[in-house]
Amino acid sequence: MSREYDLKDYRNIGIMAHIDAGKTTTTERILFHTGKIHKIGETHDGGSQMDFMAQEKERGITITSAATTAFWRGKRINIIDTPGHVDFTVEVERSLRVLDGAVAVLDAQSGVEPQTETVWRQATNYKVPRIVFVNKMDKAGANLEESIKSVKTRLNGNAVAIQLNMGSESDYRGHIDLVEMKAWEFDGKPEENGKEIEIPAEYLEAAQIERSKLIEAVSSFDDEVMMLALEEQEIPVDLLKSAIRKATLTSEFFPVVCGTAFKNKGVKAMIDAVVDYLPSPLDVPAIKGYFQEKEVLVTASDENDFSALAFKIMNDPFVGSLTFFRVYSGILSKGSYVYNTTKDKKERIGRILQMHANSREEIDEVRTGDIAAAVGLKDTTTGDTIVGDKSKHIILEKMVFPEPVISQALEPESKAATEKLSLGLQKLAAEDPTFRTFTDTETGQTIIAGMGELHLDIIVDRLRREFGVQVKVGAPQVSYRETITAKADVEGKYIKQSGGKGQYGHVWITFEPNPNNGFEFVDKIVGGKIPKEYIKTIQKGLEEKMASGILAGYPMIDLKATLFDGSYHEVDSSEMAYKIAASMALTKAKDVVKTVLLEPIMDVSVVFPKEYYGDVVGDLSRRRGQIINDETRSDGASVIKSHVPLSEMFGYATDLRSMTKGRGTYQMHFDHYERTPRNIADEIIKKRNIKN
């Protein structure tokens, strides 16, 4: 079967934004205008097609990323609509990993908001080219200029308008295209019928000034535009578009368009900008991978061996587990065998599905640049590389996800529900790399851990709805960490003689702090003092002990362990003995190096009317908060950014609502770990019945 759309005509894009900026509404309009859907569904009344989960419809927010495909001006646009709430930022992270471009949606009144910063930073990490859509231009306080300024100052983004709005707030009626110097007025009907009009006299001078700024901004990316600009010659539209595209593909220039998706103004022009300026798979650098521990580059071509990255798992009630994947090279047909190089396992693709939110269409094959879902992959999880069965066994760069910072205990309301609870948690954990579930070894309780209270609320709600499990939920708990603050050499020796074969393991390990670098194990054994086959076992023994901690039962982080000496017994030494010896050494380290408790510190952004400034700041201070930034928005609202321990943030939503008469909002996400004050740490250790 030949390719229906050339690879140069593909656009793999994500729609990303702060919560309530109008991201899903914008996506719905894109689908309507491209003919993908024939009736517009609204987020606020639960009618959005992209928000298909019951929880999304009830709460009016996006929780999980949803994929679909649309067509516009001869281009195939694969779209992923991502959540705007910080608790579900993993959905943005894994989507951006497999996308070539993105549309950042801003609220024209608020400009850049806290979660905008987070998703923008994620896109920058993956070098994803972006355009900016300033939405809600009809809203009170809407200001295109201030929104662009917020991108420049808060995101350090080189944002440049390619449109000038005509009117704002209730007077917003359309825009001037600064590239073609044409004015468009909209009737506000669902079809978004735009009428080209002569540029109104009152906007002509401003449009000429803004076009000059645009030309100046792109000239540094295109020599021909620069020469024509210096000679004060007219720049052809096609050349200017080409220069804007070239600049955008560098991820150092961000074209800005405007509109109001809900009122059906400006969305078609935004889709045009996606087609004109965002990259095809041929425009982005080759993907980095590894083959036999050497770096290789995977280029986008159907002629190359098949390679793809699994970026999402979803449990479908009708077809079972779906594995979403992005094809980076080659062709794959349904029924084929593939090789999971991450897990070193062969698997068979059953069916291949083209997804539209939660509906699906079966297809025969996928090619380079496609995003699809597979049925039948049992061992493949998020971040795994799959290649053709006979292909070179490369491994694409892995995804890295944040660790959970909050946990709760669950208890099924009946013993009969225990098995269903276990199955449900297993399936939900397979879907979400930032969700963990485990059994507390001391209490026997089932523990769930995630990125925030809303994250865990949704997990519990899904257990009830999708798996029919009623559970009792404990109070949220903070996920503390442990680490050491000094360097020491420690001996671990395990000898057991009780008849029959004995046990012998003996190690000397240097433990030292390893700030912000996780766990590092170094083997410095020389002369065969410990046989090579036991080295990995010693490392595993340390990792297992780190998971349960040595101070208060919390996982250890940022530790370097150097194995430098030890001994073995030709008869009695075993893997188990060395694992125990390593664990004993780490346990003994508590007595010779200072072990401390670390608490998660959250980045908290609060937006509220300025008359409540004193109350809000005073409350944050009482919560051990440290003010990082303080500003006043263009609409007069106060915005405070602070670092606050997670343990102090429980119940904050209720307190903020009370302080600001319901007019304050906040967002928070994990920022870093910090040493817990001694008096608080002692109390935590005491509660867990573990002596310091």
Curated annotation (Swiss-Prot):
One of its GO terms (molecular function) is translation elongation factor activity. Keywords: Cytoplasm, Elongation factor, GTP-binding, Nucleotide-binding, Protein biosynthesis. GO terms for biological process: ribosome disassembly. Gene3D superfamilies: 3.30.230.10, 3.30.70.240, Elongation Factor G (Translational Gtpase), domain 3, P-loop containing nucleotide triphosphate hydrolases, Translation factors. The keyword DNA repair does not apply. Coiled coil: none annotated. Its main location: cytoplasm. This is Elongation factor G. It comes from Mycoplasmopsis pulmonis (strain UAB CTIP). The lineage of its organism: Bacteria, Bacillati, Mycoplasmatota, Mycoplasmoidales, Metamycoplasmataceae. The gene is fusA.
